[in-house]
Amino acid sequence: MKIPARLKPNSRHREEVVVGSDGTYIIYTKAPAIEGRANAAAIKLLAKYFGVPQSRVKLVRGARAKHKVFLIDI
């Protein structure tokens, strides 16, 4: 299934996934948006949230943007 998400890198919050009022997943991560570190952290958090291995979570759109689309193979 495709998951629309908004990534919040360098977050002071704890690392977590929250569902927004519009159905978009908001991903808070402490990783910086440098060299794909925030994207890797987002994949790890989404895998934990949905209870699937990290290999089943793929970034489909938005590799260099805050608004992203992930594909999760459940």
Regions found by a protein language model. Give the residues of each.
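Contiguous, often N-terminal, cationic amphipathic patches that form binding interfaces
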Residues: 1-36, 40-43, 52-54, 58-64, ...
